């Protein structure tokens, strides 16, 4: 986490709505820090069980995606040549943080997409954790280079990955994409569903605590026709 930022700053505060606290998660995670959006614009996140807004997020723009994509491209130059041992160390720290905050992640998914807490814990959060555990297991013995006949097959990281994930398995779909990307030396720009973005933002805190180099993982919230389209079209995203 860069100097001058804190988890409280990153996650905003809380406001009162109908006698209930509304979480404010108004920052994006870009280049290793929680940052303000280029242009202020907010969206209420609805708890489907109560049909009430329980959180506010910022909606990003093309400018936010551009900032994240350029950060990811800069980071790719060095992250793509890190050793397997280095990447395993970061993955293990993410796994440890994931395990420690599993109840928080499950609770957040219950709030944002309505899964009962047992299902959110056993089938949502735990399965998401499995993707990171499996990525680390495979990476430990994966042959990135091997001889085939008279030639050598070398597997290299593809570049900057633009990831757009849905609401119904919000953390599982994030993990199933982010884990192999980080394991293989790719960098990431993630847009979680604006309908259920809070578990992904909590996951970003775990990534931050793991100490990944700035720009390796970036998160920008927003709608499909704006942030999603910008990710799909950005020249720095492979």
Language-model features, listed with the residues they occupy:
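Long amphipathic alpha-helix in the N-terminal Rossmann-like dinucleotide-binding domain
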Residues: 70, 92-103, 115-141
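Glycine-rich phosphate-binding segment of PLP-dependent enzymes
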Residues: 65-81, 104-112, 138-139
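Generic non-transmembrane alpha-helical segments
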Residues: 93-97, 101-104, 202, 206-212
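Residue-level signal for inorganic ion chemistry
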Residues: 51, 87, 109, 132, ...
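Terminal low-complexity tails and localization/encapsulation signals of metabolic enzymes
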Residues: 2-56, 89, 93, 143-164
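Short linear capping/connector segments at secondary-structure termini
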Residues: 108-116, 145-150
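Short, well-ordered beta-strand elements within core beta-sheets of diverse protein domains
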Residues: 54-60, 75-81, 128, 163
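Rossmann-like NAD(P) dinucleotide-binding subdomain of oxidoreductase/dehydrogenase enzymes
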Residues: 143-238
